[in-house]
Structure formats: structure tokens, C-alpha cells
């Protein structure tokens, strides 16, 4: 499980040079909306199904959860979520709508990075990870060795402590994948768009084509809204260090507005040319009010998906964690996940609700 992109060098060639800083007037403007080419970026879908697990054991370890998860039901439900997200009845069509390859590459050549969360004791369940990986290989035709699973901050022992089962043969668990090692520009609101921070090399140099964000559903500091899900998951893509200062929320918003996460921006129109982060999934089969450490406290048997990270986090934080579980977020902070990306509550579809199956 090497940290270097050693397989298929023609496909995965990387530049060793430092990325040139992006000028402030070439950054994504604060409040500018980001759209997926095929999917409503404001649509967040969810499903609750007790049949996804065999028994209740809310505070269980990851190993125990692996025994309890019913993989086939999880797989079928993720297909249902994809259909609802893409607004189609056929799972194959749904996945081909959600995932978009670069025009100059075949699916075989396309490089996928999957950000998992490996801090402390709550981690992605194998059934969820395997379903997404098999979607790429079995439906779209991605070469398994071009799928890379990582956590650049806390991922040194992913392959040892959470050896995801049933992955396509050749799929790579990269652990830290070299860590956050290359400086890149970070836009507003952090440091008024003049700052830089370290990021995963393969996002900075453009080696990765599609980024998938698989997050947990845990509590965290009120500074970040009182929770950690898909946006804060990228504290394991970018260096988390600046995020733990007084302007940490600015940093969290800002790194999720970078080309490294969102995709390359047209310097003239300041629009995203090709979306990089194309799916955000919250694995709340188990979840916790507090965090980020410790075992889960609850077993909601819930999954949620969307294509735009701040919208997914806002909806799951307010509608699922807040309204359903009673874990109210810090709304002053949480509302920025809408407004700093150009949206408001009134823009959300389905009366502002998660679209539940």
C-alpha cells in the first residue's frame, strides 16, 4: 500500500514542482454557487432502514459493526439513494449521471480518490466503502488500481485497523498517501484569500480526477457547528493545523472552496470547469452526539448522500442530527455552510427537507 502513485505511470504521472500560488482575483468568489453538471446540487437524499444491521449494539467497536452490517441491504439502499439523487429509476443510469469522467480520458484511465475518516474509533463500514468502489469498477469500468482510499492526517493505520473487506481486487488502501505535503493557495474567507496551506499532493498536481467524500456523523467543537461530517473530513486532505485557531471556521469554509476539492476553475468566468468532488456520503449506520473521539453512542441505521458538501452537512446537521436525534447544531456557524456558498434555506428543494426514501 505505497504512498506513491506507482501503478500505470502514464496515467498517474505527477509533477514534482511546487504549485504556483493562485492570485486572489482568480479564486472562486465567496458566495458563488457551484453546480454539478447533471445533478441538482441542493438535493440531499437519505434512508433509514433497520434491516441494514442484524442487531442493536449502539456503542460497538468497528469490528463488531462489521459483524452486524448486512452488506446486501446496504448496497441496495445506496443504489436507491443514487436513483433518488439522480432522479431516475435505474441504478446504472443513476451512477452514470452522478459520476462524470474527464472528456480526455476513458473510465479505465480515470483516477478516483476516496477520503475516509480514520480519527479515533469511528470509521467507514466496509459495506459502504465496497459499494462505492464496486460502483466504479463494475458499472463504470474504472481500473481497481486507480481507486485510492486515504486519510492524509490520521490514516497511517487504515489498512491495519480497518482492512475494508470485499473491495475490488487491486483497489488501494493508501493510508496517509504521503500526507498533506504540498502548499497551495486557500481562498476567502480565510486570511482574506491570501493564505496557503499544505494539501494532499495528488489533488494539488491534478493526478486525481474524481474525489469521493465518505464521512462519519459525529459531534465536534461548536466552532465547527457542533459536528464533523463531509466538510471537516477534509481536515484529512488539507493540514488540520490552521483549523484549530480562532479563525478555524473560515479555514473550514475556505478549503472546501479550493480547486483541489471542487475542481479547476475557469479564470475568465470563474466557474468550475470540471467537478472533482462528485459525491458526498454520510455513513450514519452508527453515529454519536459527541466526538470526535470514542465509540458511537447511537445506531440510527441512516445513510445520506448529495453532491455538494456544505449542503449535505447543513441538511444532515439540521434535519437529521438536530430535528431527529435532538443534537442541535450551532446555527450561526452552520448557516454559513449555505450563505458562504451563495445559498439560503429558501433555495433548498423539498421544502428544505432531506428527501427520504
Walk through the language-model features, giving the residues of each.
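Extended, low-polarity segments enriched in aliphatic/aromatic residues
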Residues: 18-111, 119, 123-357
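N-terminal export signals
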Residues: 1-17
